[in-house]
Amino acid sequence: MEPVDSIDYLLDAEAPGRLELVRRFANTLDEEHGREVLHSPAQLRTLLLELGLIGRGVRVTGDDLARAHELRDTLRHLALANNGIATDVALEATLTVRVDDRDAVLEPSERDVAGAFADLVGIVYTAMADGSWTRLKACRRDVCHWLFYDRSRNRSAVWCQMSVCGNRTKTRAYRARRG
């Protein structure tokens, strides 16, 4: 994998609210071009700071990096399920429910890297509960799997970008039919 500092395209496919944190975290790997943002604990720390999931004093280890890669893969598989591709994965995290007179909020029990990962799982849970999760999809193109937010009225988008992945998939199918 080629290490890169960020993958800053497809900003038009942003997810609403905190679900965007999940999309940005999951899109730290560009499968098609072999670009990896999370290539070191320092890069993971930078991302988690940018996303506001950890404080400045939090230390990030190689084990945290390995868990980040696993979490990212699981999030992508769950998002593939939103695009009609069967998957058999699950997320697990320790979260606390904070309730006041106006709201109930899931929060991580810890303020470390594990807490940051739990926060992402909590965002997924909340999105599943409010119905927005089904719109966060992973691109169907087998070498992409980029997460995008489906804003189509009938929730029918299957590719992160029709002009790229949709076109390439349709062209390949056309050529296969033509022999």
Positions of the model-derived regions?
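Residues immediately within or flanking Cys/His clusters that coordinate Zn2+
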Residues: L136-R141, A157, M162, R168
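Basic DNA-binding region of bZIP-type proteins
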Residues: S163-G179
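Short linker/helix segments within small regulatory modules
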Residues: D150-A157
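Short helix-coil boundary/hinge micro-motifs
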Residues: M1-A138, D142-Y149
